[in-house]
Amino acid sequence: MYNLFLTAPSGTGKSTIIEKILCRLNVSIGGFQVKRYLNKKGEMYFDMISFMDKKSNNIIGEYMGNKKTLPNLYTFENKGVEILNTSLTNSDLIILDEIGFLEEKAEKFKSSVRNILNSDKVVLGVLKEFDSPFLNEIRSRKDITLLNVTLKNRDYITNHILNILSSWNIPMKLYENEMIP
């Protein structure tokens, strides 16, 4: 089992690192990325975007003010599970960007995440820096490589991650004039 997760405070660049890595990989990509958006009223919400079909408008949470975010369990338990199950069947590498606290009560979704982590698929993900039973369960797994992204290492950690993925036999794209080690 090949499971690599990044963790760091918000705004450190974890998702940006994953996007840079995806540009270098020569495999089919599944999974999801959560993006934060503001609607026309200025309200913040969180959208789960599938890497399989690029579809968005899968609202998993809405910021309610006072540092409270209301999870949308229906989206996790339906669209989220669909994204994960389709990815497990149809992709070589699965992105989980990000696993946080909103899905704590989404039992079907958490079960699908466990199935992916137990599979032979390569997983590249982000774990929110938060204390919760599900996040702690993932962190404590023996088959997890957990890398801490900092402002000091974020510019060179991408190459380290690419080397790990290469050692796991993930094919990379080669570019003209690129040296092959």
Task: Report each predicted region and the residues it spans.
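Hydrophobic anchor at the beta1->P-loop junction of P-loop NTPases
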Residues: 6
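The conserved Walker
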Residues: 10
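Generic recognition of short, well-ordered alpha-helical segments
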Residues: 16, 43, 107-111
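Hydrophobic positions on the alpha1 helix immediately C-terminal to the Walker A/P-loop
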Residues: 17, 21
